[in-house]
Amino acid sequence: MSLPDTPYLAVDLDLMESNLARLQRYLDGHGIANRPHVKTHKIPAIAQRQLELGAAGITCQKLGEAEVMAAAGLHDIFLPYNLVGQAKIERLRALMAGITLSVTVDSEVVARGLASLPLGTAYVP
């Protein structure tokens, strides 16, 4: 096989599958829930495979990543990134329809922005 003469990404799919399964087995064996961060691959099919192997849900760093994953059918998303501003709150409101969404809050400003959203069960450690 000749290689392209420009930069490209090559993924050994068998090795990737082996690594995903091995990590999930290890975590399962130690009673650790896996909620992988999709920022490393940003590919809904890989996130779906992680769920099929036993991940509890996915983590997205940005609202746009969460929107892409939800549109692809992934419905349990954790968004640890603080959302500030009405435009992002409205995008979050639209995203919440039909999925389980968890967010973090680390300031009063963020909490005030989220206060207008329909909330389910809140967990406060």
Whereabouts are the PLM-identified features?
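Generic N-terminal amphipathic, Lys/Arg-enriched alpha-helix
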Residues: 1-11
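Short, surface-exposed alpha-helical recognition segments that flank or form part
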Residues: 11-14, 102
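A generic structural signal for short
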Residues: 11-12, 34-35, 54
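N-terminal glycine-rich anion-binding loops that anchor highly charged ligand groups
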Residues: 15-46, 59
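Short, basic, glycine/proline-bearing loop/turn elements
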Residues: 6, 32, 52
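Active-site-proximal beta-alpha core segment in soluble small-molecule metabolic enzymes
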Residues: 37-125
